[in-house]
């Protein structure tokens, strides 16, 4: 079963998640990105990274999409996570990488938008659990 992912915040962390998921190639599909920047800049920053170098993929864009090696990703520009139509896009997991919505109540707004789960990339408050790979990843409960 393919896991459908949305990324909220496409700065350094969001783009790194994108690249990691793209390179992993497992049953993970990035279906949407929410960021306040325009798609031309978003596509350029994805393709040309000053730290990681050039993405070895063809990257093009339209007014509301980015296409990476033929796979089209919807680009949204919503300030309020509750307004992002994750459910309509079939998103299973949202990666919250803005650094803004780190409180559980704020991150849960993605659930209101239709996402099934939210992964917060920054230290969070009132979270269900903090997981550090290599330390306590065995504590993750997929049912929660």
Label for each model-derived stretch:
Residues 1-144:
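N-terminal Rossmann-like NAD(P) cofactor-binding subdomain of oxidoreductases
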């Amino acid at each position: 079963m393919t896991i459908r992912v949305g990324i909220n915040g496409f700065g350094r962390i969001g783009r790194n998640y994108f690249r990691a998921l793209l390179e992993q190639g497992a049953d993970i599909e990035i279906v949407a990105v929410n960021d306040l920047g325009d798609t031309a800049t978003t596509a350029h920053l994805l393709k040309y990274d000053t730290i990681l170098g050039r993405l070895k993929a063809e990257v093009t864009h339209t007014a509301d999409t980015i296409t990476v090696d033929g796979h089209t990703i919807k680009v949204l520009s919503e300030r309020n996570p509750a307004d992002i139509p994750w459910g309509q896009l079939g998103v299973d997991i949202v990666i919250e990488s803005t650094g803004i919505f780190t409180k559980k109540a704020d991150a849960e707004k993605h659930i209101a938008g239709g996402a099934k789960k939210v992964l917060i990339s920054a230290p969070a408050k009132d979270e269900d659990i903090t997981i550090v790979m290599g330390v306590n990843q065995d504590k993750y409960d997929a049912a929660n």
